Amino acid sequence: LKQVYRGRIKEYVDKYPTAKYVGDGAKPWFEKGDIALPCATQNELNEEQAKALVANGVIAVAEGANMPTTPGAIRVFQEAKILYSPGKASNAGGVSVSGLEMSQNSERLSWTAEEVDAKLLWIMENIHENCVKYGTEPDGYVNYVKGANVAGFMKVAKAIMAQGVV
């Protein structure tokens, strides 16, 4: 809708009448849905709203910005065993593609869109695998916050060790 027709998001309901547009400053966090994607910056989604999402049956929350979810809301999702992915994991695609572009430029290469997509897919799969590796709790719940933090720490620690600093 946005990319092809340059339409407004609220026009989505014209084509899909079962959808609901929430506009005029209202927040979508009190609506029923399976997936929530907070994508505004810092503290968009709070504890009260997280409780409403859980009560309404959300099964996954993935950040699409830097810290749009408050610590209280994160706690609500984790206590309810909702799949919660922090922005450092789920929003890493844009930064990753920027890095790929810098690599292309420095090596004087030109990758096709398909090659970039394949590299991005590998990066995002690797992020997920590391979150699962380092974030799986004894009960099987994957704590993506813990997984992403430990994976990041391990990457830096291995680099420091490889340089002989420790």
How should these model regions be labeled?
Residues 52-166:
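Adenosine-phosphate binding glycine-rich loop
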Residues 1-49:
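A structured beta-alpha segment of the ubiquitous adenosine-cofactor-binding alpha/beta core
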